């Protein structure tokens, strides 16, 4: 049997083996009256109890105590350990695993992660940087730029496509992570509700959370239709609004343009480039079109 693989991306910590997903949860923790809750259970309260939420622990991996009154008893390493305990329940027969990690984790972070895993009796075979793990074909281009999206930003890795793929440089681009995009889409939907229904779904944390829970499905519809219909849940009755799909692209245009500006630092003259996207970032509405027009290179 092939070893299990743990892909570390806080937008979805994923354990899979033989092409089967065994565990997938967002890297977010809620400190509640019932104790710590991980993943989707925490996301259900992100807009209701924002001060009780921590979603920085994978990106700020250290043993220092967290500077937050509700998490002051914990370090980010403690929270990583807590989520890894959940992951461990899905590892078959305590099989050794391969870790795929994002470029923002350095050697010190990986050493700490190895120590956390050892303390939990999780055996790690090796660590593989995510951009290298994702590159499975030859593009016959001199340079590859790999993009992946996380909760707070996008990682961009510049790689050479020679005999063996290697990473030359990696940057972390803030202001264009999933949470920033979601917040802008929520703002668009809210403004449309006020305009079409004279109703503000953000007037209470509960209705705001109900709307937030729908965003990913709404964006999936945006990529398939010219116009989307959205059911807005209020306290008394469901209401319906319609928004042109192009408006969702316009709502995050500033984020996309920021990404393009930062990516230009990785390009140089007299080189052939391919921009390689993970599935999650490839599904963002309008992004591929913008990348193709901005860089005049193959995007896949």
Indicate residue ranges for each PLM-predicted region.
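Gly/Thr-rich phosphate-binding beta-strand-loop-beta motif of the actin/hexokinase/Hsp70
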Residues: 1-32, 137-168, 221-227
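Active-site neighborhood for divalent-cation/phosphate handling
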Residues: 75-140
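Phosphate-binding glycine-rich/basic clefts of nucleotide- and phosphate-handling proteins
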Residues: 160-245, 279
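Conserved phosphate-binding loops in N-terminal lobes of ATP-dependent enzymes
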Residues: 11-100, 168, 222-226
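Phosphate/pyrophosphate-binding loops at sites that engage ATP/ADP/AMP, CoA/4′-phosphopantetheine
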Residues: 84-97, 194-204, 256-275
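Structural motif
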Residues: 7-10, 100-104, 148-150, 277-282
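Glycine-rich phosphate-binding/hydrolytic loop that grips phosphoryl groups
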Residues: 130-142, 148, 178, 182-184, ...
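Helical "lid/coupling" subdomains associated with nucleotide-phosphate turnover
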Residues: 221-300
């Amino acid at each position: 049997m092939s070893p299990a693989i743990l892909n570390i991306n806080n937008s979805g910590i994923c354990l899979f083996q033989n092409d089967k997903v065994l565990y997938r949860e967002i890297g977010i923790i809620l400190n509640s009256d019932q104790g710590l809750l991980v993943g989707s259970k925490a996301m259900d309260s992100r807009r209701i109890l924002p001060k009780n939420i921590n979603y920085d622990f994978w990106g700020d991996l250290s043993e220092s105590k967290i500077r937050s009154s509700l998490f002051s008893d914990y370090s980010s390493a403690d929270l990583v350990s807590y989520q890894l305990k959940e992951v461990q329940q899905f590892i078959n027969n305590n099989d050794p695993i391969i870790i795929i990690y994002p470029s923002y984790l350095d050697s010190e972070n990986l050493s700490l992660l190895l120590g956390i895993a050892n303390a939990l009796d999780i055996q790690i075979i090796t660590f593989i940087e995510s951009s290298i793990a994702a590159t499975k074909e030859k593009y016959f281009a001199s340079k590859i730029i790999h993009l992946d999206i996380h909760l707070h930003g996008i990682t961009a890795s510049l790689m050479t496509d020679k005999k063996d793929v290697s990473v030359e440089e990696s940057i972390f681009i803030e202001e264009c992570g999933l949470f920033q995009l979601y917040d802008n889409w929520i703002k668009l939907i809210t403004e449309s509700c006020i305009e079409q229904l004279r109703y503000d779904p953000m007037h209470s944390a509960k209705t705001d959370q109900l709307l937030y829970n729908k965003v990913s499905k709404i964006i999936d519809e945006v990529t398939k239709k010219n116009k989307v219909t959205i059911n807005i849940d209020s306290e008394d009755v469901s209401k319906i609004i319609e928004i042109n799909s192009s408006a969702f692209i316009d709502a995050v245009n500033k984020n996309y343009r920021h990404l393009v500006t930062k990516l230009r630092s990785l390009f140089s003259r007299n080189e052939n480039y391919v921009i390689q996207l993970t599935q999650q970032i490839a599904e963002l509405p309008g992004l591929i079109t913008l990348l193709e027009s901005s860089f005049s290179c193959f995007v896949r």
